[in-house]
Amino acid sequence: MNPPGSLEALDPNVDEHLSTQILAPSVHSDNSQERIQARRLRIAARLEARRREALGEYLDGKKESEEDQSKSYKQKEESRLKLAKLLLCGTELVTNIQVAIDIREIHRRVEEEEIKRQRIEKLENEVKTSQDKFDEITSKWEEGKQKRIPQELWEMLNTQQLHCAGLLEDKNKLISELQQELKTKDDQYVKDLKKQSDDICLLLERMEEQVKNVMKTFREELYNIEKAFEVERQELLASNKKKWEQALQAHNAKELEYLNNRMKKVEDYEKQLNRQRIWDCEEYNMIKIKLEQDVQILEQQLQQRKAIYQLNQEKLEYNLQVLKKRDEESTVIKSQQKRKINRLHDILNNLRSKYAKQIKQFQEENQSLTSDYKRLVMQFKELQKAMRHFALIDDEKFWEIWLMNEEEAKDLIARAFDVDRIIHTHHLGLPWAAPDFWFLNNVGPISQQPQKSATQIVEEMLMRSEEEEAEEAAAEPESYLDLPKQISEKTTKRILMLLCDESGFLIESKLLSLLLPLEQNECYLLRLDAIFSALGIESEDDLYKLVNFFLKYRAHRLSSSLQIKPCSQASMEKASMEETSTRSELELAEQTEMEGEKEESLVEGEKEEEEETPPSPWVIHPNDVLKILEAFVMGLKKPRDSRAPLRVQKNVRDNSKDSEYWQALTTVIPSSKQNLWDALYTALEKYHLVLTQRAKLLLENSSLEQQNTELQALLQQYLNSKINSELQVPPTQVLRVPTK
């Protein structure tokens, strides 16, 4: 009944799959934490593959075609799936103990390695220090041999004795620490043995319980399958008998119907053949007449084309003469331009000389400014270094002063709590419970709250949207996230849903197949988590940057679309101004055609502007999502990849709650309890006065009792004396003897 597989023997397919991932941790890494993470990932992948195989799922996301299945088959499949799930859950329940033990052992080994490393470092440091002390003592002996004065020798011997005693004390201290560590290891070993025995007992109990559950479930499912087969057998017998009778009746009816239809079709086909012959003859005559008319029309068009050709030839000759005159005019203009070019060359040479002088002057100024810049940069770096140094010192001093004051305040609070406890339990006879304030558990300055991840923000948003779906009919303002520009949560949700729908290629096919049976919000949450991990979005700020980037892109596109219309009109007017005014008939015709097209395009553009409605500023086209993501990822990688210059990076601490914290420490004992203490103090003073008076009276009473006993003893001695019997009137007859 041992669970199949262990931590060391893993599936080779899972190992190869994990090794192909570039960013995944490796089991061959030098970092122990990375090796532990790699083993955990391989175990999780292997267990997931076994679970899918047991449940009948396929890794490629394909499902078998659903056919008409009988009740017995459905019952068998349900029983198989139920038993597979039961076995899988039982195996996981049993193997969870081994996994927990393995993880605990891994943590213990890591801690043991760290302790061993620290112990080795400590021993090495001790060896170095003891060797230095021994060398110092040895060198002092050489110096002592050179001294001749007894006083100096005596002082030197005392110092050497002190050094030797210190060296031996360090060694004894180290030996005691190692012995104490060995003792703790023995105790830990006994505890581990006890824990292992408890785990084995728990494992056996779970295995016995799973065996009983599996046997019981197998019997129930076997009974259900037998019952389903019996019901299906009765239904099949009844249905097959009924189908056979219906099939015989339908066959006889179809044979009669087929004979009647065949006779009708033969008659219809004969009539259709006669009608088709008549229609074909009429159509042939009509086509012949039409073709003769087309021949006559084509002959007339040929004569018209010949006349147009003659007219175009005369126009071309006229245009040739016009071009020759223009060529003569262009030669005159070329000569004028050459003279102008020569004059401009002279001006260019003068400007080049001035430009060279300016470049030389600017280079000298640049060198001087560069030297000043380097000097200022060095001063700035030194200033930054000093600022970092003083900032660290200030933080350390602030931390020490805070801890000192906090410790002193908490000591006073503890003394006050002890006094309050004694008053309640001893004097008032009331039960006392220690107050639980939030500031008593705080140690050190109050820090800021940790930033949420992008996945947590999306999860909170989806949960909030589910709660607000029932209240959408009410006219309430939209809730806002903590965004820089107060973007509504509804807009953020739309953008994330669009991103989830259009970025499915960033999600693995295995994950998509697993998301099919989940609910909509859970599916969206897992898809967005995978997309965020692929895009490198980790923190809350990255999510807000993504939403702002989408909205800025949409606003930029709207502004550019509004600028296209005036630009297009200006370009068309400029093109019309640049057209050359020619007197030829062809150019005039082309110009008129272009103006007509321009007017038509303007009219159509005005109609389209009137017909189109302005798009919503929050609507983003799905085709633009990939472009926006590409631009966002490129912009997100640049600040992360580029190394910013060294600067003073100091976390600004939020000190808004410091006064509240120290004020809360001073008000641990409320005013009502202080009034109770004052009243109790006055009552105790009165009680103390009464007790002192009572003590004085008790002392006086004890002294009087002692005197009374002494007097009684003297009186008894006097009465018992022999002289009383000799008297004529004894005092016993006169005096009344007191009885005890």
UniProtKB/Swiss-Prot annotation:
Residues 570-617 are annotated as: Disordered. Residues 101-388, 691-724 form a coiled coil. InterPro entries: DRC1/2_N, DRC1/DRC2, DRC1_C. One of its GO terms (biological process) is mucociliary clearance. Disulfide bonds: none annotated. Residues 587-598 have a biased composition (Acidic residues). Residues 575-586 have a biased composition (Basic and acidic residues). It is found in: Cytoplasm, Cytoskeleton, Cilium axoneme; Cytoplasm, Cytoskeleton, Flagellum axoneme. One of its GO terms (cellular component) is axonemal dynein complex. It comes from the Eukaryota. Keywords: Cell projection, Ciliopathy, Cilium, Coiled coil, Cytoplasm, Cytoskeleton, Disease variant, Flagellum, Primary ciliary dyskinesia. Component of the nexin-dynein regulatory complex (N-DRC) a key regulator of ciliary/flagellar motility which maintains the alignment and integrity of the distal axoneme and regulates microtubule sliding in motile axonemes. Plays a critical role in the assembly of N-DRC and also stabilizes the assembly of multiple inner dynein arms and radial spokes. Coassembles with CCDC65/DRC2 to form a central scaffold needed for assembly of the N-DRC and its attachment to the outer doublet microtubules. It is linked to Ciliary dyskinesia, primary, 21: A disorder characterized by abnormalities of motile cilia. Respiratory infections leading to chronic inflammation and bronchiectasis are recurrent, due to defects in the respiratory cilia. Patients may exhibit randomization of left-right body asymmetry and situs inversus, due to dysfunction of monocilia at the embryonic node. Primary ciliary dyskinesia associated with situs inversus is referred to as Kartagener syndrome. Spermatogenic failure 80: An autosomal recessive, male infertility disorder characterized by reduced or absent progressive sperm motility due to multiple morphologic abnormalities of the flagella, including short, coiled, absent, and irregular-caliber flagella. Belongs to the DRC1 family. Component of the nexin-dynein regulatory complex (N-DRC). Interacts with CCDC65/DRC2, DRC3, GAS8/DRC4 and TCTE1/DRC5. This is Dynein regulatory complex protein 1. It comes from Homo sapiens. The lineage of its organism: Eukaryota, Metazoa, Chordata, Craniata, Vertebrata.
